[in-house]
């Protein structure tokens, strides 16, 4: 059973928690995150039978998401996020999901604004790794999705260390992209990235802290970008939309729907 686990915390801008400017534009593009989460679950179900995949939402203790079709969403409630900003909340929630959540099988931890464009089972069955992390242009981690194939003592230690790396950064530098930079700092430390050298990232399988870490390209047969990005792989399993790129979201959704319908 594959577990798709997006993180979503509904932001109350009157809660007194400081956020970077980027977060203040959270809902300025597209249809809104409730819509994206509903479509994300819908596209997952196109490609996976009920016994193959399950959809959860990792969140704080109060956020609710209403389904516009199908059953209620299964919420994974993470304590202690009320006084945390969005990126810190996401990082803490991801750590909890990978290390403690009561779910079995591979975990695909993601954001909200995604489209599933294929069945993950064959790739997971045929690919040897413990954790998969995307690298954009072999330079920067993009955690549109982080995949944990199996939970072990080593993977728990890895994600705890990643959380330590997050808190080693100054609050201002981790408030936006800190969730991604914490992975990058591990890559710098392990020699998978070289500071000041673009394109230095090493794709493929690496051993870090006893874990088989698979570095995959952001833009490829697993994780494709949006339709007007530098890459567009029609058969990629998963698509990511960020910021003003959401204006092309419905085009990508229609393409994914057509591809799925053509397989029926």
Which ranges hold each PLM region?
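Short, hydrophobic beta-strand segments that form beta-sheet elements in well-ordered domains
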Residues: 52-61, 106-108, 113, 131-132, ...
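Short, polar loop motifs at secondary-structure junctions
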Residues: 58-65, 116-121, 219-222
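N-terminal anchoring/stem segment of glycosyltransferases
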Residues: 1-85, 99-104, 153, 262-264
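Catalytic core and acceptor-binding pocket of nucleotide-sugar-dependent glycosyltransferases
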Residues: 153-261
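A generic structural signal for well-ordered coil/turn residues at beta-strand boundaries
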Residues: 141-142, 230
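A structural signal for well-ordered alpha-helical segments within the folded catalytic domains
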Residues: 38-41, 88, 92, 177-185
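GT-A fold catalytic core of metal-dependent nucleotide-sugar glycosyltransferases
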Residues: 75, 82, 86-140, 146-156
């Amino acid at each position: 059973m594959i577990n798709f686990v997006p993180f979503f915390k509904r932001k109350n801008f009157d809660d007194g928690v400081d956020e970077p400017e980027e977060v203040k534009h959270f809902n300025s593009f597209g249809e809104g995150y409730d819509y994206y989460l509903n479509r994300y679950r819908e596209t997952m179900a196109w490609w996976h039978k009920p016994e193959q995949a399950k959809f959860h939402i990792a969140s704080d203790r109060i956020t609710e998401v209403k389904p516009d079709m199908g059953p209620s969403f299964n919420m994974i409630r993470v304590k202690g996020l009320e006084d945390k900003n969005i990126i810190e909340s996401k990082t803490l929630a991801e750590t909890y999901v990978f290390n403690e959540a009561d779910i079995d099988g591979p975990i695909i931890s993601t954001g909200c604004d995604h489209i599933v464009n294929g069945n993950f089972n064959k790739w997971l069955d045929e690919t040897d790794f413990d954790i998969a992390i995307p690298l954009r242009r072999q330079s920067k981690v993009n955690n549109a999705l982080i995949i944990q194939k199996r939970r072990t003592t080593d993977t728990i230690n890895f994600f705890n260390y990643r959380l330590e790396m997050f808190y080693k950064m100054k609050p201002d530098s981790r408030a936006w992209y800190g969730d991604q930079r914490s992975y990058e700092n591990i890559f710098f430390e392990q020699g998978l990235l070289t500071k000041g050298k673009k394109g230095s990232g090493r794709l493929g399988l690496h051993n870090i802290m006893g874990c088989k870490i698979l570095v995959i390209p952001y833009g490829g047969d697993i994780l494709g970008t949006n339709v007007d990005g530098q890459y567009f792989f029609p058969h990629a399993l998963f698509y990511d939309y960020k910021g003003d790129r959401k204006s092309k979201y419905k085009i990508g959704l229609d393409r994914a729907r057509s591809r799925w319908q053509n397989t029926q």
